[in-house]
A protein has these predicted regions:
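Small-residue-enriched, tightly packed secondary-structure blocks
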Residues: 27-260
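Bacterial N-terminal signal peptides
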Residues: 10-20
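Sec/Tat signal peptide C-region and signal peptidase I cleavage site
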Residues: 20-26
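Bacterial N-terminal signal peptides that target proteins for export
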Residues: 2-11
Length: 260
């Protein structure tokens, strides 16, 4: 005797399909997508942390004008980059590496959208040990940033770099002319000083920039474009720039860049 199924046939078929591993809701594909989203969110969190660390470094080194970056140099900076916690390791042959953030002054004297960068460089010598240093670069013109448009610039090679002047004595000097394209500073164990980092290579952190500004965002788009707004994660750094080098203290002409 034929017994009528308790559930319609299409319901039973659907249950069979959903019971197959990897098919339907909750399968491995969905788990993979969720994992990717979580990893991306974690990475974005790292960018936010990097921007906040850079902001803190910038604010801390300006607390003591007697031993910090001259205010006149900050006011006339075309761009400022901060790389917190640059690690330098040496064991016969050493090297340095760090991740930071850079922003460029706009024609209206405000600060544009920051881009994420990386620095690396080798050092040779019979040193053993590991040191952590905060590094700041002050760009006095757009020439120092041109290499970054091609995603790479070697300091001291592609762009001139010099140890930055320190304190009010440098600012008060009658013959002080900020004629180097880039001035570099370092802070290690609480000590702050100008430091020439020749041989250091600065590149765009493409993966970080794409996460925050979109898959097609380039260094040119972020630093020299007019349509991109600063990512929310970079707000602490922009706020710090507005505090140490506020709007209205600098006049600059818009730079025309050729697209490649």
């Amino acid at each position: 005797m034929f017994t009528k199924p308790k559930y319609p046939t299409y319901v039973l078929c659907l249950l069979c399909v959903l019971s197959v591993p990897g098919v339907g809701l909750g399968g491995p594909k969905d788990e993979k997508e969720v994992k990717e989203v979580k990893n991306e969110s974690k990475d974005v969190g790292k960018e936010a942390e990097r921007a906040l660390s850079a902001a803190n470094v910038l604010l801390e080194i300006t607390k003591t004008p007697e031993s910090g970056i001259p205010q006149d140099l900050l006011n006339h900076a075309d761009a400022i980059a901060v790389i917190p916690n640059v690690v330098k390791a040496a064991l016969g042959v050493g090297g340095r590496h760090g991740k930071g953030i850079v922003a460029r002054r706009l024609p209206n004297s405000g600060w544009g959208a920051p881009a994420f960068i990386e620095v690396s460089g080798g050092s040779f010598g019979l040193q053993i040990g590991v040191s952590v240093t905060d590094v700041i670069f002050v760009f006095t013109n757009d020439d120092g940033l041109k290499g970054l448009l091609d995603d790479k610039v070697e300091l001291g090679g592609d762009a001139g770099v010099a140890a930055g002047p320190v304190g009010r004595s440098a600012e008060a000097g009658t013959n002080v002319t900020f004629d180097s394209p880039i001035y570099s500073y370092s802070r290690s164990k609480g000590l702050f000083a100008g430091l020439a980092l020749k041989g250091t290579v600065m590149t765009m952190d493409g993966s970080a920039n794409r996460r925050l500004y979109g898959d097609k965002a380039t260094g040119r788009d972020i630093l020299f474009g007019s349509s991109l707004q600063a990512a929310t994660e970079t707000k602490p750094f922009v706020d710090a720039l507005n505090r140490v080098a506020p709007k209205g203290t600098h006049e600059k002409k818009a730079m025309k860049t050729s697209k490649k």
